[in-house]
Regions:
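Short, basic, glycine/proline-bearing loop/turn elements
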Residues: 18-19, 87-93, 119-124
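Glycine-rich helix-loop-beta junction characteristic of Rossmann-like nucleotide cofactor-binding loops
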Residues: 34-38
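A transmembrane-helix-recognition feature enriched in membrane-embedded lipid enzymes
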Residues: 2-33, 57, 78-88
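Non-catalytic C-terminal accessory region of glycerolipid acyltransferases
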Residues: 1-10, 41, 100-205
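Catalytic core of membrane glycerolipid acyltransferases/transacylases, capturing the structured
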Residues: 39-97
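Short, well-ordered alpha-helical scaffold segments within catalytic/effector domains
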Residues: 28, 52, 100-103
Length: 205
């Protein structure tokens, strides 16, 4: 696992603004449900995952700095694997050798009131919404912070489509918060999170 090196709040905020500008210019970009994001305090974004570029529209939608937790073996873009941790502080996780330092790093960010983004499916491979992993629920319950079910729509294969005369539609939808407490069951919260994500997605997803 590569240790994250988050840039300053200002630099990451500028990256968020730049992401919003880029998404707005290159795609028909829209955001729904932003009122569901807590105005302060830490929370966990739990989006579906269909393409390596999914963090870009999420960053654009939130703008404020986010700490991403992503599986290193699932990232297929070599430039992003090298650029993400250096520029923004993405935590790349080796799932075959998960280290205690990974958990400590995320805990540290939560204690600093950071927004955390974890893709519960853990992969972009396969069709449709896949089974959720337990990481989102684990960190939410451990810290008693809300989960924000999130839908990312329209990013699959988007890099190959950019540059054509037609601007593709890309949308980010934030669902209602799932509030957690220390007594909650991890599997129940995981199932509820995936159920709420599914509600936000198109029927033909």
């Amino acid at each position: 696992m590569r240790e994250p090196h988050p840039r300053s709040w200002l630099i990451r905020y500028i990256i968020g603004v730049f992401s919003l500008l880029l998404c707005s210019v290159l795609t028909k970009f829209s955001v729904e449900g932003k009122k569901n994001l807590p105005p302060s305090g830490p929370y966990i974004l739990a989006p579906n995952h269909i393409d390596d570029v999914d963090p870009a529209p999420i960053t654009a939608a939130v703008v404020k700095p986010i700490t991403y937790l992503m599986a290193e073996d699932q990232i297929e873009l070599p430039w992003y694997k090298a650029w993400g941790p250096w520029s923004y502080g993405v935590t790349l996780v080796n799932r075959s050798n998960l280290q205690i330092s990974t958990i400590k790093n995320i805990q540290k960010q939560i204690q600093k009131n950071e927004r955390i983004c974890i893709f519960p499916e853990g992969t972009v491979k396969g069709e449709g919404l896949k089974e959720g992993k337990r990481g989102v629920a684990y960190f939410a319950i451990k810290n008693e912070i809300p989960i924000i079910p999130t839908a990312v729509i329209g990013t699959k294969g988007i890099l190959e489509k950019i540059g054509s005369l037609k601007r593709e539609s890309v949308k980010v939808i934030f669902g209602s918060p799932i509030f957690t407490s220390s007594g909650d069951n991890i599997d129940d919260i995981t199932a509820l999170t995936m159920k709420e994500i599914k509600k936000l997605l198109p029927e033909d997803y």
